[in-house]
Design a protein with these regions (language model features):
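Short, low-complexity N-terminal intrinsically disordered segments enriched in polar/charged residues
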Residues: 24-47, 55
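Short solvent-exposed beta->alpha transition segments
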Residues: 35, 50-103, 108-110
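Exposed beta-sheet edge and beta->alpha loop/turn motif
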Residues: 95-156
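Generic recognition of cysteine residues
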Residues: 5, 22-25, 42, 106
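Sec-dependent bacterial lipoprotein signal peptides
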Residues: 1-23
């Protein structure tokens, strides 16, 4: 009877640990959230899927993405199809202390970049993009505004 009781406690402990482990897997850390958001955005952005990129963007970024989308033509899409999709990985990420802003540095391989002026497309085998993220209604969004002349971006 004593062995049975010990086995029961052991089973209960194992089940508790398993349940706790499963539950904790589902809760993403802020770090994981910002990195996944950055990857999702970059995969859409650098594969010219601007409607999906917009879903991960701040309201102020929408017009810039619409402008970029208007520069994408059939020749651009054909070249993208020939080369294959851009591949994205995270190099580093940082979240501010109050968990409202973050930045993620992504490496994008096999990418095309369309220059906003003139719509000329350039192939880049590897590039880095530093993304600024802000938390809006408990969701991390990318702030990708029109680059200013002095290199700074406008803010929401």
């Amino acid at each position: 009877s004593r062995i049975f009781c010990t086995m029961n406690k052991l089973h209960t402990l194992i089940y508790s640990v398993l349940i706790f482990t499963c539950l904790s897997c589902q809760q993403q850390t802020p770090q994981t959230q910002i990195e996944q958001t950055a990857i999702d955005f970059c995969e859409a952005f650098y594969n010219f899927n601007y409607p999906v990129a917009k879903e991960w963007s701040t309201p102020s970024s929408q017009s810039y993405l619409s402008f970029l989308a208007s520069n994408v033509g059939q020749p651009h899409l054909e070249q993208l199809k020939t080369r294959g999709a851009a591949k994205v990985s995270v190099i580093s990420s940082e979240i501010d202390a109050n968990l409202e802003e973050a930045s993620v540095v992504c490496q994008i391989k096999n990418a095309f970049v369309i220059h906003p002026i003139g719509g000329k497309m350039e192939y880049v085998s590897s590039l880095q993009d530093t993304l600024e993220l802000v938390r809006v209604n408990n969701k991390w969004l990318i702030r990708k505004d029109i680059p200013q002349q002095n290199g700074k971006q406008s803010h929401d």
